[in-house]
């Protein structure tokens, strides 16, 4: 009888531990990392969270790496996965994009930084199977990009929107068809080409906001400047055709390297934008204007049904994000930079509370 009681107690304790380690308490990353590509997916009852590449706390070019960490919800800690391959034989990338589709993770683009400070956009992209932990190389992006937005549609298509390509921004919407494994061009992004923008998609509706444009002048050198603008795109019967509309900006002040995600509030689709900085910056967190950048705490919520912005309470400030994840209906950022440009190992919970 005593043995049965002990056995039952152990089972109850284990069950309670698994619950505690679900969405309520996600473990920190094995090490601080920022500008990392993140995604999550659920397969046969197990949820996987992955962090691809990024930059470490030193924030120098030598701190950029190819490390991959994966956490299985309900388990302790993270596992080290094989590093992301590189056809260019670089030691790491930042500003890559990652999504989950058809029980796999996909990682696209990003850039490496050489010892002399020069940057190179990565041409190769990969699919990672979280079960076998094997990479499959995809066909190269027609125009390689970093600091772009990646969105999935109909569990088949992936859109790579705008971003930087070696020498300048592009206005392209490059579509990858996971059925045919081919790339094609969708209706181009209608605004100024930007990098470091954020976006999310619900159904056939996508929303892209902000980023940094390269502006040209007659009396001075070109300069990187924030671009406060939001564009709503609706995909038609043809997945390559997007009807774009300019919509009102929620504040009139752009944020750089924030992240966005689709979630539901009271059963309605909402596109939520979190984090970023109002002072665009280099990969070390120092602004292009020479001033240290600080993360923003504002939360923007766009109602897809009502086609308008809703007010929400602030959240924990964090910047240098590539994307967000949703676990058990709760939104988290993974890594990034917090106050003082400190690279973080934390998975920060961002409750969405409408005002």
Listing of model-derived features with the role each one plays in the protein:
Residues 1-2, 18:
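Non-catalytic, low-structured ubiquitin/UBL-interacting segments
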Residues 2-13:
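Bacterial N-terminal signal peptides that target proteins for export
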Residues 21-355:
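Kelch-like beta-propeller repeat domains
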Residues 12-22:
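Hydrophobic h-region of N-terminal signal peptides that target proteins for export
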């Amino acid at each position: 009888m005593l043995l049965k009681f002990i056995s039952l107690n152990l089972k109850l304790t284990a069950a309670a531990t698994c619950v505690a380690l679900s969405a309520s308490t996600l473990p920190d990353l094995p090490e601080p990392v920022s500008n990392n590509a993140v995604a999550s997916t659920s397969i046969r009852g197990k949820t996987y969270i992955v962090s691809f590449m990024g930059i470490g706390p030193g924030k120098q070019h030598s701190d950029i790496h190819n490390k991959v960490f994966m956490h299985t919800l309900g388990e302790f800690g993270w596992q080290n996965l094989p590093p992301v391959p590189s056809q260019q034989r670089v030691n790491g990338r930042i500003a890559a994009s990652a999504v989950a589709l058809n029980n796999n993770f996909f990682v696209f683009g990003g850039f490496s930084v050489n010892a002399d400070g020069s940057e190179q956009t990565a041409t190769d992209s990969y699919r990672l199977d979280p079960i076998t932990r094997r990479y499959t190389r995809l066909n190269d992006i027609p125009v390689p990009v970093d600091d772009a937005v990646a969105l999935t549609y109909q569990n088949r298509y992936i859109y790579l929107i705008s971003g930087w390509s070696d020498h300048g921004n592009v206005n392209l919407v490059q579509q990858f068809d996971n059925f045919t494994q081919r790339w094609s061009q969708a209706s181009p992004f209608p605004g100024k080409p930007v990098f470091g923008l954020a976006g999310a998609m619900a159904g056939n509706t996508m929303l892209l906001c902000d980023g940094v444009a390269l502006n040209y002048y007659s009396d001075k050198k070109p300069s990187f400047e924030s671009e406060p603008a939001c564009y709503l795109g609706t995909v038609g019967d043809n997945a390559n055709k997007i009807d774009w509309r300019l919509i009102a900006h929620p504040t009139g002040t752009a944020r750089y390297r924030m992240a966005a995600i689709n979630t539901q509030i009271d059963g309605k689709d909402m596109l939520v934008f979190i984090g970023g900085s109002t002072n665009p910056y280099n990969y070390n967190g120092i602004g292009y204007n020479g001033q240290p950048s600080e993360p923003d705490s504002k939360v923007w919520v766009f109602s897809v049904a009502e086609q308008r912005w809703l007010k929400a309470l602030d959240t924990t400030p964090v910047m240098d994000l590539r994307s967000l994840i949703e676990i058990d209906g709760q939104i988290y950022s993974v890594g990034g930079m917090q106050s003082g440009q400190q690279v973080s190992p934390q998975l920060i919970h961002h409750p969405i509370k409408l005002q």
